[in-house]
Amino acid sequence: LKPFELSFEHNEQSRRIVEELEQVYPDFHGLNLTHEVRQGLMKHQTPWDQKNNHFEGASLEAQVVNLSDEIAYNNHDVDDGLRSGLITENQLQNLPIWQAATEKVTQTYGEIKDQTIHRARTVSKMIGLMIQDLIEASNPEKNLICFSPQVATWNKELKDFLADNFYFHPEVLALSKRGQQIIQDLFANYHQSPNHLPKEDQQAISTGVPLEIVIKDYIAGMTDEFAEAERERITSL
């Protein structure tokens, strides 16, 4: 998108989906969502998103969703890393959040010899610890959802660990590069041959929506499996 002075921001794309692209009502585009829900979509942040944007405090619902998303992603990535063998439990032993979760698992179940079950219960305990901490640390007088200082530190250490040992692992980077190539191939093909796009997208182009925006919207809605299959389809035409 850079050559066309465009960029992809998942918050903005979420807004486009719920306000413009979804067509389930006869008299207007988008979904019938409240202002608070749409505001939450735009204010959802990660350390990599919207670096130059500064928002007023999001609604409580949006704050809860934002931190719940972080809990889910971090712990799911730990589970993925362990399942794939790219990280090990021994590596995680230095993380206080893993130590605390392991201790609780031992207190509850004793020694678990099955590593698959032990991993599942420990990741589940990490999720439980973070959720319980959010509940206890959120101060209604400040109207703010947050971790306590201790678990905020644990969470940062967990994210740093994932960045150092999982996100930039050679196998993960190779998969990421492959995904980028698939997206680039799709974009280039559609841009050169718009007739390869679905008929509804071709219709959008005919009504004046820029081709690059239509392609962006279409690719953004693809699953990994569909994107791979679609590249195979259009390159064989």
Residue locations for each model-derived region?
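Short helix/strand-bridging catalytic loops that position acidic/His residues to coordinate divalent metals
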Residues: 1-5
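Histidine-centered, transition-metal-coordinating active-site segments
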Residues: 7, 11-13, 17-237
